Amino acid sequence: MSQPRLDELLGTLTHELRSPLVTIVSAAQLIANERDMKPSVRRALAVMERQSRQALRIIDDLFDTCAGTEGKLSLRKEVIGLADIVAAATETASHLLASRQHRLTVSLPPGPVFLEGDLLRLVQVLTNLLSNAAKFTDPGGHIRLTARVEAGQVVLRVRDDGRGIDPDLLPRVFDLFHQLPGPAAQKTGGLGIGLALVKSLVELHGGSVSARSDGPGTGAEFVVRLPVRADGSC
């Protein structure tokens, strides 16, 4: 199947799958508002809603990745503070980090730094990288998020002390549907969409993303480079 045909098929599938899932989430919320309900039924509804929302996030990520690859994903450009992006992303990822007992260290440059881009999409980029680091790091790990301004670019680094990546596999980590081999990677779940979406969104912002690792057991680092606002302010 040709790539354009595959992209069209994926776009159709995501649309067809999303509609019934939205209905399931809405129905679960509506039923959960009923007062006279057994605790076991309420718990089952909560699980149903949570799993449906998780599936929706996967579908939305897939749709956005396909749209970005085709140049059909629009961005809402505005002036954004780097600190706002980091704060929103760390808050979004906080539940996953806490559930795995990870320690997160954040280091930002002194003074305000501004970018021009889509706030929600840039938060999504950083959240995906933090979530990826959390999933591939054993419980109780240390994840570092650092931001610097270098040569007119904002450089964001997400470093973990997790399972690491075979250097031979690094060129493919951003490929759509690519998953690292081995049982340890399979335990994390996912479909290999998150990093592909990161690459697509970063490139739409005129930036680049790369990954490095010295091999299994050495952790991994993902580096995002984005243009800083020319005057450095809003």
Residue positions per predicted region:
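Short alpha-helical segment of the dimerization/phosphotransfer core of two-component systems
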Residues: 50-55
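Primarily the dimerization/phosphotransfer
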Residues: 1-30
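Conserved catalytic submotifs in the C-terminal HATPase_c
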Residues: 76-81, 98, 103-113
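Conserved micro-motifs of the catalytic ATP-binding
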Residues: 70-75, 114-117
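Short conserved segment of the HATPase_c
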Residues: 165-179
